[in-house]
C-alpha cells in the first residue's frame, strides 16, 4: 500500500515538473523607444533570461529623449559592465517574467 502511494506521488511530482511555463519577456526586434517596446513574448524552453540592449541615449541638449532599446529572450545573456568605457551597446539581463521593462 505504501509503495503504491509512493509511486503515485512520484508520478504527480514528475508531471508537475514538466508543466512549468516558459519565461515571458518584453521583445522588440527593431530598435525603438523603451516605452514603445512592449510586445510580450513567451520564450523558448531553452531561454533563461530576458535581455535589453541599450542602443542609444541622447547625449546632447535638451537630454529629454527616451532611450532606444531592443528587447528579447536569451539562452545566454551576458551583461556588460555599466561602468565600462567604450562599450558599443550596454546589455542588461534579468531572469523572471517580464523583468525587462525598465530602462
Curated annotation (Swiss-Prot):
Subcellular location(s) per record: Secreted
Gene assigned in the entry: SLURP1
A Pfam family of this chain: UPAR_LY6
Subunit structure: Homodimer. Interacts with PLAU. Interacts with CHRNA7.
Gene Ontology biological process terms in this record: cell activation; cell adhesion; locomotory behavior; negative regulation of cell migration; negative regulation of cell population proliferation; negative regulation of keratinocyte proliferation; neuromuscular process controlling posture; urokinase plasminogen activator signaling pathway
Protein known as: Secreted Ly-6/uPAR-related protein 1
Keywords: Cytokine, Disease variant, Disulfide bond, Palmoplantar keratoderma, Secreted, Signal
Role summary: Has an antitumor activity. Was found to be a marker of late differentiation of the skin. Implicated in maintaining the physiological and structural integrity of the keratinocyte layers of the skin. In vitro down-regulates keratinocyte proliferation; the function may involve the proposed role as modulator of nicotinic acetylcholine receptors (nAChRs) activity. In vitro inhibits alpha-7-dependent nAChR currents in an allosteric manner. In T cells may be involved in regulation of intracellular Ca(2+) signaling. Seems to have an immunomodulatory function in the cornea.
Induction or repression: Regulated by retinoic acid, EGF and IFNG/IFN-gamma. Down-regulated by IL-13 in cultured human bronchial epithelial cells (related to asthmatic condition).
Amino acid at each position: 500500500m505504501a509503495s503504491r502511494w509512493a509511486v503515485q506521488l512520484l508520478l504527480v511530482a514528475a508531471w508537475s515538473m514538466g508543466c512549468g511555463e516558459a519565461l515571458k519577456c518584453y521583445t522588440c526586434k527593431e530598435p525603438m523607444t523603451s516605452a514603445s517596446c512592449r510586445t510580450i513574448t513567451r520564450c523558448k524552453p531553452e531561454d533563461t533570461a530576458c535581455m535589453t540592449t541599450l542602443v542609444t541615449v541622447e547625449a546632447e541638449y535638451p537630454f529629454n529623449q527616451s532611450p532606444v532599446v531592443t528587447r528579447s529572450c536569451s539562452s545566454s545573456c551576458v551583461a556588460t559592465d555599466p561602468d565600462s568605457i567604450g562599450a558599443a551597446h550596454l546589455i542588461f539581463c534579468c531572469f523572471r517574467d517580464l523583468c525587462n521593462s525598465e530602462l
